[in-house]
Design a protein with these regions (language model features):
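Charged active-site motifs of nucleotide-sugar-dependent glycosyltransferases
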Residues: 5-7, 190-197, 226-229
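Active-site and donor-binding regions of nucleotide-sugar-utilizing enzymes
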Residues: 6-186, 199-206, 220, 235-237, ...
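Donor-nucleotide binding loops and adjacent catalytic segments primarily
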Residues: 32-35, 205-265
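A short acidic (Asp/Glu
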Residues: 106-107, 191, 243
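Glycine-centered helix-boundary capping/hinge motifs
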Residues: 160, 188-190, 250
């Protein structure tokens, strides 16, 4: 009888976690020769790797009091549904990825269910920068922590939390090997144009606060030098809002949505 496939439940609530989750899925499929099945929450990149997301993570792209308050019922419902789905699936392990605000609530709620399912979190909360006390209590609902930076384990291991440094995807990826020539050719950008990339974030509140400032800066720069060409790489969670704001500015600015275009930009 063939071995049972490894069941892994992934929870990624933001585009950054979606990218990490997709990389993790590829690595695990390779490591297990495909003898693994995934369930959980994720975005487009994880969906391409075979995940059928429990819900659209655009619902979690919130930041700031004005957006959080009206979204509380929906977020709480997603937390309950995620935990209920984990209990139903009975995976071998649950891996929450980044998005600590959402992930920690899922982990705590699942622990209260006393399922005995191992709980792993991928991407340490930045306790070295703020809210250091979180490191003291994480062991209560996280069984193992995976960190991106080599100095991070020392902040958690003294508090009985097994922690492993696994490397940063930016260093391991081909982020520096984007094809700028192909990007210019695809969008007919003249060689003399100087490309400036505008990065307003992946949360609605970030975009609302930052993009107007960036657009006004772009307007002023265009008035002083016509050789600037502005590109706004964006993700599905905020793409509609970004495009509306760019159109409303009246400026000729390219919004890059595909992974390839974002990479090449």
């Amino acid at each position: 009888m063939p071995n049972r496939k490894l069941k892994i439940y992934l929870v990624a609530g933001e585009p950054s976690g979606d990218a990490l989750g997709a990389r993790l899925m590829r690595a695990l499929k390779k490591k297990t020769d495909g003898n693994v099945v995934f369930s959980g929450v994720g975005g487009d990149l994880m969906e391409k790797e075979g995940l059928k997301p429990l819900f659209d993570i655009s619902d979690l792209a919130i930041m700031g009091l004005a957006e959080i308050i009206p979204s509380i019922p929906k977020v709480l419902r997603h937390i309950r549904n995620t935990v209920d789905d984990i209990v139903r699936v009975q995976p071998d392990v649950v891996v929450t990825i980044d998005s600590w605000s959402f992930a920690s609530r899922v982990q705590k709620a699942l622990r209260r269910k006393k399922t005995g399912i191992p709980q792993v979190h991928y991407v340490a909360p930045q306790v070295w920068a703020w809210k250091k006390k979180r490191a003291r209590t994480m062991y209560k609902y996280v069984d193992h922590l995976l960190t991106l930076l080599p100095q991070e384990p020392k902040y958690f291991t003294p508090y009985h939390l097994p922690t492993t440094f696994v490397g940063h995807p930016v260093i391991e990826s081909n982020v520096t090997r984007g094809d700028a020539a192909a990007f210019r050719k695809k969008f007919d950008i003249a060689p003399e144009k100087r490309i400036i990339t505008v990065l307003p974030g992946s949360r609605h509140n970030e975009v609302a606060r930052l993009l107007p400032v960036f657009l006004e800066t772009a307007r002023q720069l265009k008035q002083t030098d016509g050789n600037f060409y502005f590109v706004v790489p964006t993700v599905k969670t905020v793409a509609k809002r970004v495009k509306e704001m760019v159109r409303g500015s009246g400026l000729e600015i390219l919004v890059a949505e595909s992974e390839e275009d974002r990479h090449n930009a």
